[in-house]
Each structure stands twice: as structure tokens, then as C-alpha cells.
Amino acid sequence: MGKFAELTDCELATMKCVWDAKDNITVPEIVEKLKENYGLDYKPTTVYTFVKKLYDKGFVDYFKRGVKFYYPKRTQAEYIQSELNRTCEFWFDGSKTELVSALLKGESMSTEERKDIQQLIDSLDE
């Protein structure tokens, strides 16, 4: 899997709106979703700049049917995996054990979450 370009927080929120869209999405729709989902109130020209940067970085593409409709070129799962790998390499010297340990020590977990995690661990042996 190739390394993805890093995204700024604004680009990432914009990309999340594209990933979450059930269909292709326009800049005005992204503006609305950014406000609804993240409380980010950007002008359409600002969001267009974010989308242009995402296009330049290879995250989105578009087609034009009166207006530009954007769609993801990279999946959310690919990006998450890339970010987790990058975090693991940089902060934990490649140790997945240290990464998981840091994640689990950070917050308290419900009994349900503990059971789910144990099932995931048990399934690794299968």
C-alpha cells in the first residue's frame, strides 16, 4: 500500500464529508455537511480550495454536469490504515503492541468494548 499525502485538519474534515456522502457530492453540499457535522462554517470558495487540494493530492476526482460533482479516489479504509501504519512507525517504532497498549490505556472501556476487543484478539489465532 502506498503512502498517502498528509491532509490538514480542514482537508480531512472535507474528505470525511466526501467519504460519508452516499453519492457524488458538490461543494455547496460539502459546505452544509461541514457545518452540520463538525460546526465548521466555511464559505464555498474556501471549501473549493480544500477540494482542489484534495484533487491535487489524488484523494478526489470529479465530473461536471452543470456543476462539479466530487467522488473519492481513495477509500476511507485505505486512508485509516495508512495513518495507523504511519503513527505506529513514527511514535511506536513499528510496535503494534505499543500502539494498541497506548490506545487501550487512554480511556476507560465498557464491558461490551472489552468483550469485543477480546473476541478480536481471539480471532487472530484462528
State where each predicted segment sits.
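Short alpha-helical segments that sit at the start of domains
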Residues: 1-17, 21, 79, 126
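Short acidic, hydrophobic short linear motifs in intrinsically disordered regions
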Residues: 24-34
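Short helix-coil junctions and helix-kink-helix linkers
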Residues: 32-42
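Short, hydrophobic-biased segments on the C-terminal half of alpha helices
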Residues: 48-52
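A short, conserved structural fragment
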Residues: 55-65
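Short, cationic-aromatic polyanion-contact patches
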Residues: 65-84
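Amphipathic alpha-helical dimerization/coiled-coil segments
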Residues: 84-125
